[in-house]
């Protein structure tokens, strides 16, 4: 009721019961990574449904203030622009927008490096595993910088509890296990080294043993550009 939305509906003897396991999943994510909301100023990027979910979690966990950031801020609602957000004094940033989501990776609308005092940056986006926002937060030395994959898994586990009408005693362990397995499948292995050091040979062996697709970037560049690598270097240099 506080969020105004459900994502899990269970039929119990003809009556429909609605639950929001996104709330539970986000709460699990924050607890698992030591995000402390008590007395903190929280900055939430975005104004959609996930904003309401994360805002409810932050408030329930004792946040002193929850601020909303929008590309088109409604000043009557007290919303901030991204430029204003930098000087908000927030300790916690939560991204609920699709900024940085695959295939538009590399997008980051907030300059976290210019925000001293940040304790945590949480991004609900789970593909890629680390968005540009999370990468920049890590580079800036923010103590906690985490993406949304574990939230996705947690909300699914909690939804399964409602559907099956039973609690999983080992739910936290199972959430960690599934998250780790998904992360292994999601992440690529990149081999970097000098010419003729064996990257292609080792890459093909790894791909075969792990059941993954092998991609040679030199071959992909030649396909796209229509020139050989030596010809490209000769014409444009190696930088």
Task: Kindly label every feature range from the protein language model.
Residues 1-33, 128, 134-136, 140, ...:
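Phosphate/diphosphate ligand-binding glycine-rich loop within oxidoreductases
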Residues 199:
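Conserved lysine of the Walker
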């Amino acid at each position: 009721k506080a969020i105004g939305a459900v994502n899990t509906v269970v039929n119990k003897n003809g009556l429909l019961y609605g639950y929001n396991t996104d709330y539970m999943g986000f709460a699990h994510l924050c607890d698992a990574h030591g995000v402390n909301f008590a007395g903190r100023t929280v900055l939430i990027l975005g104004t959609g449904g996930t904003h309401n979910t994360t805002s409810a979690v932050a408030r329930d966990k004792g946040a002193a203030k929850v601020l909303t950031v929008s590309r088109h801020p409604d000043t009557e609602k007290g919303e901030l622009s991204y430029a204003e957000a930098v000087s908000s004094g927030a300790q916690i940033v939560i991204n609920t927008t699709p900024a940085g989501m695959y295939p538009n990776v590399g997008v980051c609308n907030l300059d976290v490096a210019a925000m001293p005092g940040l304790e945590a940056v949480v991004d609900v986006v789970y593909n890629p595993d680390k968005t540009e926002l999370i990468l920049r937060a890590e580079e800036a030395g923010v103590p906690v910088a985490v993406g949304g994959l574990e939230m996705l898994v947690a909300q699914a586990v909690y939804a399964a509890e409602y559907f099956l009408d039973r609690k999983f005693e080992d739910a936290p362990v199972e959430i960690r296990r599934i998250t780790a397995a998904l992360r292994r499948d999601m992440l690529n292995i990149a081999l970097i080294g000098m010419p003729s050091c064996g990257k292609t040979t080792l890459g093909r062996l790894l791909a075969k043993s792990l059941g993954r697709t092998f991609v040679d970037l030199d071959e992909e560049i030649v396909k796209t550009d229509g020139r050989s690598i030596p010809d490209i270097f000769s014409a444009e240099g190696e930088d």
